């Protein structure tokens, strides 16, 4: 059975593990398809402390949330959400951002991320948010396919270079 719940402070170490697995997976994808972008995702030496503080602030924030997914009472993934300010020239003042989605590899393709997405949309709606966005590396084909199934569409194509 799939259960989705709000994260608690005692979940932070678990979320840190999930975030590390997510990062390691992204490094593999980046190394394979676009190694020139490794510079963009290089971690600071004290990233764990920084991430711990960030996660704690998101758990307590009115403008952020973290959801944990459990499969048969075992935590198997998470989603981090935030509310972002739009550029001041736009009518839309705020939008929702899905910052992170991670499901342990052995539990994928079971509808768990979709359940997380459903809870995220409920949370955003409760905050009167009408638009939701996320970032995804273009080489992460599996994630892109999932997000398209959720109804997300491409909006901006970001390009980078080293100077």
How should each PLM-predicted stretch be described?
Residues 24-54:
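Conserved GNAT-fold acetyl-CoA-binding loop/helix
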Residues 46-67, 97:
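A short helix-loop-beta-strand connector motif used in the catalytic cores of GNAT acetyltransferases and
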Residues 100-103, 109-122, 149:
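Conserved acetyl-CoA-binding loop-helix of GNAT-fold acetyltransferases
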Residues 82, 92-105, 157-160:
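Conserved acetyl-CoA binding element of GNAT-fold acetyltransferases
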């Amino acid at each position: 059975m799939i259960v989705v719940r709000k994260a608690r402070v005692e979940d932070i170490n678990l979320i840190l593990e999930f975030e590390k697995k997510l990062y390691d997976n992204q490094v593999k994808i980046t190394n394979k398809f676009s190694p020139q972008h490794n510079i963009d995702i290089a971690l600071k030496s004290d990233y764990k402390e920084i991430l711990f503080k960030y996660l704690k602030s998101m758990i307590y924030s009115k403008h952020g949330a973290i959801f944990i997914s459990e499969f048969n009472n075992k935590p198997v993934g998470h989603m981090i959400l935030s509310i972002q300010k739009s550029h001041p020239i736009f009518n839309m003042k705020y939008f929702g951002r899905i910052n992170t989605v991670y499901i342990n590899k052995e539990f994928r393709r079971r509808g768990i991320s979709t359940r997380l997405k459903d809870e995220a949309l409920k949370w955003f709606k409760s905050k009167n948010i009408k638009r939701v966005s996320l970032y995804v590396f273009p080489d992460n084909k599996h994630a892109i396919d999932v997000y398209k199934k959720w109804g997300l569409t491409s909006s901006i194509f970001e390009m980078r270079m080293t100077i």
